Amino acid sequence: MKTTEAGKDAVKLLKKQNLVPVPDAPFPSFYNALSNKVYIDSSLNPADIAVNLAGTARQLHHKQVLTKLDMAEMKAADGVQCYRLMQADAEAHKALMYYALKSNEALPYSPEMPGGISVHSVIIQKAMGASDEKALDAAVKAFYNDHQAVQTCDLLYARNQHLTAYNIDRNPSLAPGAKLFSKDMPDKIFEKICSVGGVPYVKQEDFNKTPFKIMFQNRRNDIARMVAPFSKDTSIMKMPTFEKVEAANAAARALATKNR
């Protein structure tokens, strides 16, 4: 896979949408599911628009992989993990597009560096000669080191899923037969989320480790309370918490000091 292939994949997805320029928009670019349109801040330079559209195109890809109903029916723990990964994938693609444009000195415009950890991971990986696949894989995994970004994902998951579940619960005709927060995540879904042209660039089993599942306890409890009116699903309570892991680490350090 080359950067041009990732770009072509993004263009295919964006071609199907109505792109709406908005001067001084509150976001560089974003997809509105209700209007099925992509809004772009037309005051940005073309390079910055391209970087942000790379991330928005991934949102459209995710929409094809997991529908809103799929997310509503997925058990909370699995839903949280998918939601995080989708954001990580979008950030990784923005970072790769930034690197490609920044590296091309012939372009008349230069993009601003995106925020977050992912872009630094891409720059380091590409400087070491890594392929685009490896750079994307590393960028996705680096995203999880930004605990504030991950916690924001968890907050957005809770808000969005509560609204969806509430609407379906009040109006069953919106999704006849839907069983909220009841299903396990589909097989190999991580590899489908993180794929370009149908080719995955991550391995699902890499994300079974604690660093990719850990949560703040208060956010975990908030999600459990959100799910309770709609389902008996308690999967979220099995997710490890920073507080518990830190307590275990502190106990281990104390024991090591005592045994010196």
Where in the sequence are the language-model features?
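Substrate-binding clefts and substrate-entry loops adjacent to catalytic sites
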Residues: 66-80
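Pan-zinc metallopeptidase signature
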Residues: 125-260
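Active-site recognition of the HExxH zinc-binding catalytic motif
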Residues: 50-65
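Post-HExxH zinc-binding segment in Zn-dependent metallohydrolases
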Residues: 76-120
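Structured segments of extracytoplasmic/periplasmic soluble domains
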Residues: 4, 60-64, 93-104, 146
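Active-site-adjacent bridging/hinge elements
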Residues: 28-32, 61-70
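Auxiliary, metal-adjacent structural segments of Zn-dependent hydrolase domains
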Residues: 1-38, 42-46
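Soluble non-cytosolic domains of exported or imported proteins
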Residues: 43-52, 77-85
